[in-house]
């Protein structure tokens, strides 16, 4: 298993700087991009950022990047990645999402199917399994995503599961409550300090107030998110 990964913390448009600041406060060097912030870290970093980032949506591992102008290039690119360092024998690995933007490859279901085939072939080769015998996917789930932008494919593994905004205390919600990570970003951008009054003009479900209260007592999202994905990934749960 690899000791260091390239990771991305995804964020809503316009909130990348807030997520980058949170990462730097945790001690990581960052590279801010559209909709995400890149950083390097090991297994501990995956757990730590899933636990403590408040404005991010998800934490994903970048498995690899390569040109993909044809389905053959896509297959060979996915096949060439070192999947044995990410997926244990028996793991479930659905290609949960494919996105193609401004690229020659645009049929997203086909991208998913080709990518799945490539991962299966690679694991069959590594674990010495016959090609005609399907892999048993009965273990922990590792959701794989393939994004192709301007003919460049990026392959990722989602480590979060349920989006981090679902860390809330609510058992019910109204028509359009603000997401907890958006509330956290608003509070960060407002430069509010604990010695000042905090007023939530929308009130409603008191998301902004409760988000700040959770922050003040350093409530970990793991305690509020019982379906936290990393708890189910046996290969990483020792962290």
Regions found by a protein language model. Name each.
Residues 155-189:
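SAM-dependent Rossmann-like transferase core, predominantly class I methyltransferases
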Residues 45, 101, 152, 161, ...:
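Short loop/turn segments at secondary-structure transitions that flank enzyme active sites
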Residues 144-157:
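C-terminal edge-of-domain segments
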């Amino acid at each position: 298993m690899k000791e260091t990964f390239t990771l991305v913390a995804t964020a809503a448009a316009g909130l990348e700087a807030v997520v980058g600041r949170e990462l730097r406060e945790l001690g990581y060097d960052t590279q801010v991009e559209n909709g995400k912030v890149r950083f390097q870290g090991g297994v501990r970093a995956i757990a730590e950022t899933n636990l403590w980032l408040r404005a991010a949506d998800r934490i994903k591992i970048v498995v690899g990047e390569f040109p993909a102008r044809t389905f053959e290039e896509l297959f060979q690119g996915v096949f060439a990645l070192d999947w044995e360092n990410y997926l244990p024998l028996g793991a479930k690995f659905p290609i949960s999402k494919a996105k193609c933007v401004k690229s020659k490859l645009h049929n997203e279901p086909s991208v998913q199917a080709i990518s799945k085939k490539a991962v299966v072939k690679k694991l069959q080769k590594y674990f010495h399994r016959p090609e005609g015998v399907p892999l048993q996917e009965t273990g922990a789930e590792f959701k794989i995503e393939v994004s192709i932008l301007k003919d460049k494919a990026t392959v990722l593994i989602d480590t979060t599961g349920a989006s981090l905004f679902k860390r809330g205390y609510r058992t019910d919600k109204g028509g359009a409550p603000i997401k907890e990570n958006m509330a956290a970003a608003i509070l960060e951008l407002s430069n509010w300090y604990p010695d000042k009054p905090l007023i939530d003009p929308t009130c409603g479900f008191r998301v902004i107030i409760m988000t700040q209260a959770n922050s003040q007592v350093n409530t970990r999202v793991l305690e509020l998110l019982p379906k936290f994905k990393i708890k189910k990934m046996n290969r990483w749960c020792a962290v």
